[in-house]
Amino acid sequence: MEEVPRRQPGGLVEAEGVFQVYEDWECWDYVSQRVPDERLQRWLAMLTNNQLRRQVIREAQIWIWKHKGAAVRRNCGCRLCNPGWGSQVRNVEL
């Protein structure tokens, strides 16, 4: 019976994780400047939940693939520069 591959401490797995972070950041930096406002607000709201981060990046990669020559619409895609309905989630006191 075959054994499941084990994760070795300090091996290539961590290095791949670091590269994944940079790829995700580059994807977000590119797409957040080009997507329509409604989609950006939806993604910013989804990013408040850590479990949805991979889904946002996956949707962003698909959007990039479908809209290869999209023009830049804004200088920055962060929540501070683009406040919207997703921004009010943090202001609620429970």
Swiss-Prot record:
The keyword Repeat does not apply. GO terms for cellular component: host cell nucleus; virion component. InterPro entries: Lentiviral_Vpr-like. Coiled coil: none annotated. Keywords: Cell cycle, Host nucleus, Virion. Seems to function as a Vpr-like protein, since it mediates host cell cycle arrest in G2 phase. Cell cycle arrest creates a favorable environment for maximizing viral expression and production. This is Probable Vpr-like protein. It comes from Maedi visna virus (strain 1514 / clone LV1-1KS1) (MVV). The gene is tat.
